[in-house]
From Swiss-Prot:
<keyword id="KW-0175">Coiled coil</keyword>
<feature type="DNA-binding region" description="T-box">
    <location>
        <begin position="104"/>
        <end position="277"/>
    </location>
</feature>
<protein>
    <recommendedName>
        <fullName>T-box transcription factor TBX2-A</fullName>
    </recommendedName>
</protein>
<dbReference type="GO" id="GO:0006357">
    <property type="term" value="P:regulation of transcription by RNA polymerase II"/>
</dbReference>
<comment type="subunit">
    <text>Binds DNA as a monomer.</text>
</comment>
<feature type="compositionally biased region" description="Basic and acidic residues">
    <location>
        <begin position="412"/>
        <end position="430"/>
    </location>
</feature>
<feature type="region of interest" description="Disordered">
    <location>
        <begin position="606"/>
        <end position="688"/>
    </location>
</feature>
<dbReference type="InterPro" id="IPR002070">
    <property type="entry name" value="TF_Brachyury"/>
</dbReference>
<dbReference type="InterPro" id="IPR008967">
    <property type="entry name" value="p53-like_TF_DNA-bd_sf"/>
</dbReference>
<dbReference type="InterPro" id="IPR048387">
    <property type="entry name" value="TBX2_3_RD"/>
</dbReference>
<dbReference type="InterPro" id="IPR001699">
    <property type="entry name" value="TF_T-box"/>
</dbReference>
<feature type="compositionally biased region" description="Low complexity">
    <location>
        <begin position="621"/>
        <end position="636"/>
    </location>
</feature>
<dbReference type="Pfam" id="PF20627">
    <property type="entry name" value="TBX2-3_RD"/>
</dbReference>
<dbReference type="GO" id="GO:0045893">
    <property type="term" value="P:positive regulation of DNA-templated transcription"/>
</dbReference>
<keyword id="KW-0804">Transcription</keyword>
<feature type="region of interest" description="Disordered">
    <location>
        <begin position="301"/>
        <end position="436"/>
    </location>
</feature>
<keyword id="KW-0238">DNA-binding</keyword>
Length: 688
């Protein structure tokens, strides 16, 4: 609580003041502080001590005329003509003023309060707010404040503290800030705290808005004034009660110098968006979007590094950890060569061998079509898949750069393993149905958990940059997710900044994948084998290639990473989807989806007509052979369309066998042409 620093005289107004310069000329009250009040009225400092004699001079004063020409002979005149400017009858009051938010002001004062000033004006924080008591309830008061220089020094911030740097610059014009509610009764002022939060500080000396003009790097002291008057015009003739709070002094700066002050303002000012990470600006929103994905990426990398294999035992993967990972490394050599040397005994590069396997798998499947419950046969297959060594398909780069000896060795390895695959296929579930083939190669993402897609699954697939793409539309329940290549243009610029087309080849091997496993493409390399090619994520991590889970936003700055993951994405896998390893998931023909300069092996999945993918139903259990005429690479033998299969579940094994033989012949013709023209530039045809 403060008593008046300058207690007024007993008489509120006396006409015979000494002709001295006033602390604040009339222009400080009217012209500068409140532009709406008599902007042309400028009174000389000594004019307030000269009483006016008659009504004509009083009218001149009210009209805003300059009064410096008034002679000394008017001093003896009576004051009845200015009776309207005299104060009302004397009232008894004893104003007391308390500073609001004093604790916060003390915190700032202890460090050294700084207030930013700008050309356009900046508000103070903490705002100057006081609570007034002891006023006369009926009398009217004008409340105002001003900011004056605390000393005649200029300061600088050096070695984390403020020190004197020289003499002060010439003082800026003084301006009073009159509270917008003035004049008001004492009862109104005492009802609530009086806030001067709209006061703005500026360093623009030619400011026209009535802001308080200050010099940067100078110390200032705010002052609060109470004037008992019922009209703004009475201010020059009224007694000022002035209150000073030393804890509110500050140094004016154009930018905060002390980091502690900056942090205090961030912690306490709800409008300090410029410093805060969380805000409504685009920059802050971008940070908010990237933070969760970065945290998820770090957690998943750590989890996959520590126990990627332990996740393999989960039959129902969490929606945030999908069983598909996209290869993120552009260098083919460490992954592809290791793949060829380590487990290509299971991966076939021979198209003819693949054709034979397709026929065998087609013959081995039962004609009965139904969805088997998630029971022991599936778990057996899962166990077999886990017991086998990690498998990966050969990449387009290794096929492109490899020599004929590599092909021959792979073919011999494939011949050794063909019989075991055929035996495994004969034991497989009767549920893997043959679905009618299209003339293009649709990308299929099988699901492997309860056969319904909820909104949470779709949210977990929301890729950064791909959420609005047309092939990420909501799916109907109970069906595999089909991404048809005809739905997006597969040109070299199909995905922005792409050129990593071979990453699209990362497809799931549906039912036998674990949370921590990365499934690679089976296109042209083992389509009919029952063991899906996958390798553990921790192996990639050991080579320095982090592999985040598919769920959530990809933290990588490359859009082609997200694009590859989108095209090759797998949802949490349905228990009825063990059919894919036994089906010719990716056909035996040469790579289909292609980007220059990479070859992309993507095959034809066993699917119904794409028009029926949204309808829940059983898989069609017929022949497992895939259509050969869907190669996007121009070949010497034209594509021979095969009649589409019926969608009914009553397809006979004979018809399936006949179609399989026809397709085998077409595949053989196509493969012979591709073998002779392996070096033809890819990607010249587009899907129809």
């Amino acid at each position: 609580m403060r008593d008046p620093a300058f207690p007024g005289a007993a008489m509120a107004y006396h006409p015979f003041h000494a002709p001295r310069a006033a602390d604040f000329p009339m222009s400080a009250f009217l012209a500068a502080a409140q532009p709406s009040f008599f902007p042309a009225l400028t009174l000389p400092p000594a004019a307030l001590g000269k009483p006016l004699s008659d009504a004509s001079l009083a009218g001149a004063a009210e009209a805003g005329l300059h009064l410096s020409a008034l002679g000394h002979h008017h001093q003896a005149a009576h004051l009845r003509s200015l009776k309207s400017l005299e104060p009302e009858e004397e009232v008894e009051d004893d104003p007391k003023v308390n500073l609001e938010a004093k604790e916060l002001w003390d915190q700032f004062h202890k460090i050294g309060t700084e207030m930013v000033i700008t050309k356009s004006g900046r508000r103070m924080f903490p705002p100057f707010k006081v609570r007034v008591s002891g006023l006369d309830k009926k009398a009217k008061y004008i409340l105002l404040m001003d900011i004056v220089a605390a000393d005649d020094c200029r300061y600088k911030f050096h070695n984390s503290r403020w020190m004197v740097a020289g003499k002060a610059d010439p003082e800026m014009p003084k301006r009073m800030y009159i509270h917008p509610d003035s004049p008001a009764t004492g009862e109104q002022w005492m009802a609530k705290p009086v806030a001067f939060h709209k006061l703005k500080l500026t360093n623009n000396i030619s400011d026209k808005h009535g802001f308080t003009i200050l010099n940067s790097m100078h110390k200032y002291q705010p002052r609060f004034h109470i004037v008992r008057a019922n009209d703004i015009l009475k201010l020059p003739y009224s007694t000022f009660r002035t209150y000073v709070f030393p804890e509110t002094d500050f140094i004016a700066v154009t930018a905060y110098q002390n980091d502690k002050i900056t942090q205090l303002k961030i912690d306490n000012n709800p409008f300090a968006k410029g410093f805060r990470d969380t805000g409504n600006g685009r920059r802050e929103k971008r940070k908010q979007l990237s933070l969760p994905s970065l945290r998820m990426y770090e957690e998943q990398c750590k989890a996959d590094r520590d126990g990627a294999e332990s996740d393999a035992s989960s039959c129902d993967p969490a929606p945030g950890r999908d069983s598909l990972h996209s290869p993120l490394s552009a260098e083919p050599s460490p992954l592809r060569l290791h793949r060829n040397n380590r487990e290509e005994k299971f991966g076939a590069d021979s198209d003819q061998e693949l054709d034979r396997r397709e026929i065998r798998s087609a013959r081995s499947h039962s004609p009965v079509g139904h969805r088997s419950p998630p029971s022991s046969p599936r778990l057996e297959d899962r166990g077999k898949d886990k017991s086998t060594p990690e498998k990966k398909s050969d990449s387009p780069e290794s096929r492109k750069d490899g020599s004929d000896s590599l092909f021959s060795s792979i073919r011999s390895l494939e011949k050794d393993k063909a019989e075991s695959r055929r035996k495994e296929d004969s034991k497989s579930d009767p549920e893997c149905g043959s679905l009618s083939k299209e003339t293009f190669a649709p990308l299929m993402v099988q699901t492997d958990s309860p056969p319904h897609l909820s909104a949470s699954h779709l949210q977990s697939l929301a890729l950064s940059g791909l959420h609005g793409q047309q092939f990420f539309n909501p799916l109907n329940a109970g069906q595999p997710l089909f991404i048809h290549p005809g739905q997006f243009t597969m040109g070299p610029g199909a995905f922005s900044a792409m050129g990593m087309g071979h990453l699209l080849a990362s497809m799931t091997g549906a039912g036998a994948l674990d949370n921590g496993s990365l499934s690679s493409v089976q296109g042209a390399t083992g389509a009919a084998n029952p063991f899906p090619f996958h390798f553990s994520q921790h192996m990639l991590a050991s080579q320095g290639i982090p592999m985040p889970a598919f769920g959530g936003l990809f933290p990588y700055p490359y859009t082609y990473m997200a694009a590859a993951a989108a095209a090759a994405s797998a949802m949490p896998a349905t228990s009825a989807a063990t059919t894919m390893p036994r089906n010719p998931f990716l056909s035996s023909t040469r790579p289909r989806l292609r980007f220059n300069p990479y070859q992309i092996p993507v095959g034809i999945p066993p699917s119904t007509n794409l028009l029926t993918t949204g309808l829940p139903g059983s898989l069609n259990p017929g022949s497992e052979s895939s259509k050969p005429g869907s190669s996007r690479e121009s070949s010497p033998i034209p594509d021979t369309p095969v009649p589409k299969r019926s969608h009914s579940n009553s397809l006979s094994p004979k018809a399936s066998m006949k179609d399989s033989i026809n397709e085998l012949q077409n595949i053989q013709r196509l493969v012979s042409g591709l073998e002779s023209q392996r070096e033809i530039s890819p990607g010249r045809e587009t899907p129809k």
